[in-house]
């Protein structure tokens, strides 16, 4: 925010001038104290940007954000926390949308850009978190692993066709694979945060099928299980390619039978969300169509019954 913005002129400079002028008229000897007080208050307001959170995302221009924390989740998965310019700032990302990360990668002819969905929300001011799995051929994911605390990352957004609004449908079924859980988690947390018991009005039912290869690949399982335990209208069904002994979830690939058993049946007030590796998404598009859901488009739109991130 500019120091000479109308908000600062009307909210800082004019009130400060009136306070000093009024003090001068009433009691001149108190003027230095009035000046000192207004300087402190004005400085605090200018530094924090006022009490209203400031949205920092720019959809047309990349901005650089400083890496402040790295938390290893596994040998190839990490949560990267980037600081926003001010403690009260928020990213300004609508629920369901994502951001673009850009970097100049050695050996690439031009700047590489990839999309990611933060696992944090605008309820958490001053930073945003990205859960990223590093792939051997992943340009941006590998680049992120080289960042040190204090380094910066170029970010632009928001982008995407999905903008979740409370009660946009009666029942949402989700199928996620690997790091495809990130947009699902964003929506799940938003729905539960806005439940009637929490002072909101969202009564949307949520069912999630979360597929992975090994037990250790189930990202954010503790957080997901906690959310499901707290919310009777949110259910999870885990699927593993290599299940451990005594496993009670699904085994192998997600099948039409699993979808039929664990997700809502096709209806006008039902939406199915898909996010995961391309081969999985291709298979899930065919599976949902075979079960009577509307055929997924190559590029999803908000109104689609089957939406692919």
Curated annotation (Swiss-Prot):
GO terms for biological process: protein histidyl modification to diphthamide; tRNA wobble base 5-methoxycarbonylmethyl-2-thiouridinylation. CDD domains: cyt_b5_reduct_like. FAD binds at residues 145-160, 171-208. The keyword Oxidoreductase applies. Its EC number is 1.6.2.2. SUPFAM superfamilies: Ferredoxin reductase-like, C-terminal NADP-linked domain (SSF52343), Riboflavin synthase domain-like (SSF63380). It catalyses: 2 Fe(III)-[cytochrome b5] + NADH = 2 Fe(II)-[cytochrome b5] + NAD(+) + H(+); 2 Fe(3+)-[Dph3] + NADH = 2 Fe(2+)-[Dph3] + NAD(+) + H(+). It is found in: Mitochondrion outer membrane. Its cofactor is FAD. NADH-dependent reductase for dph3 and cytochrome b5. Required for the first step of diphthamide biosynthesis, a post-translational modification of histidine which occurs in elongation factor 2. Dph1 and dph2 transfer a 3-amino-3-carboxypropyl (ACP) group from S-adenosyl-L-methionine (SAM) to a histidine residue, the reaction is assisted by a reduction system comprising dph3 and a NADH-dependent reductase, predominantly cbr1. By reducing dph3, also involved in the formation of the tRNA wobble base modification mcm5s 2U (5-methoxycarbonylmethyl-2-thiouridine), mediated by the elongator complex. Belongs to the flavoprotein pyridine nucleotide cytochrome reductase family. Monomer. Component of the 2-(3-amino-3-carboxypropyl)histidine synthase complex composed of dph1, dph2, dph3 and a NADH-dependent reductase, predominantly cbr1. This is NADH-cytochrome b5 reductase 1.
